[in-house]
Amino acid sequence: MRTNIIIIVSLFALLTGGCEDKPVPVPFEPTPYEIDIPFGFPTNLNIPDDNPMTVEGIQLGRYLFYDGRLSGRTEPDSLMSCATCHRQERSFEAGVDHPDFPGGFPHGLTGLQTHHVMLPMINLVWNSTGYGWSGFLYPDNPVEELRNIEDFVRLTVLAKDEIDGDTATVKNLFQTIDGYPQLFEKAFGSSTVTFRNIERAIAQFVRTLISSNSKFDKYMRGEVQLSQSELNGYVLFTTEEGADCFHCHGGFGNPLFTTHLFYNNGKDTEFTDPMDRFSISGDPMDHGAYKATTLRNIEVQGPYMHDGRFATLEEVIDFYSHELQVSPYINPLMHHINNGGIQLIPTEREDLLNFIKTLRDDEFLTNENFSSPDSFPDEK
């Protein structure tokens, strides 16, 4: 009997001792991040159900967006990140003054130039019709890997004319960099780095890149007044008999200043680009059609159009004024095509330009939350 009691007591001590030594799992509870929808902006946001916004995910995404080791390499001449081409001061576009890409025409680590110039990364959380000049990434794409910003990250890393990397190499590299595994654990509940979570983190950060505090925004909120020239330009912008910009770029009631749709806007008469909207839709009327980009911060971007043919906004306005090209595929909304353009006189062109410049948001262009971190996780 005494022996049995000793055995039971010993077994109890062993079991309770084991319980004390067993680590208690830390619950995975990332901090939800709710986008503060600006005045007058749409309430529908394009955020995938499998990638909810969190403070930790956005923080990690910001590091990854700017870290040149996203190339999967560590040699100084082989570093490339999202920010290499998407510069904050140029509304996350390359810009004509890019130090490494003369004229704003980017090329990848292989030296191969990108097929089209960069699009700005701005207010993309409201884009639900398709990403890229042709809209080849869209939510209901039958190809699951071609649907959203997350997929864009992967394609950018793999593209020969961009990072020219390998997803396995990239995720393995970040697994070895001090500080990153801990950030992945905080953001996604596991210190094991996966490329899928790299995609998710960067996409979360990109969805925070919201511009909503330009002079025009302040005017709409009743905080400032526009000059007479700017008001004249606004009237031109929003009227069919004026500059007729609003059909493609939105007018009153569309603070995004884009419809996110695709148009043949009369640039050419021959269409040989294998990456226009027709390549996606198969609709013959989409020959030579490309996304109407947002005009927010357009002043600091450029070059303009899908192929960067115009270096300045003045050139763009001149084109729409009297250089439109007739073709069988011209979009029906180009109502002034038979006149060769909208035929603006010099003062009207100046007024239109002055209005477009009111869409510049310097707060967005300098927001420290969007800027490169002072240091990366392994440098702290």
Q: For the regions a protein language model found, what residue spans apply to each?
A:
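A short, charged helix-loop
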Residues: 143-187
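Sec-dependent signal peptide recognition
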Residues: 2-9
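Flexible glycine/proline-enriched surface loops and loop-helix/loop-strand junctions
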Residues: 42-46, 154-155, 163-168, 186, ...
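Stable alpha-helical elements in mature extracytoplasmic
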Residues: 57, 81, 145, 149, ...
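C-terminal motif of bacterial Sec signal peptides marking the signal peptidase cleavage site
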Residues: 15-18
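Short glycine/threonine-rich turn/loop motifs
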Residues: 23-146, 214-319, 324-331, 367-380
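C-terminal capping alpha-helices of c-type cytochrome domains
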Residues: 171-182, 186, 190-212, 299, ...
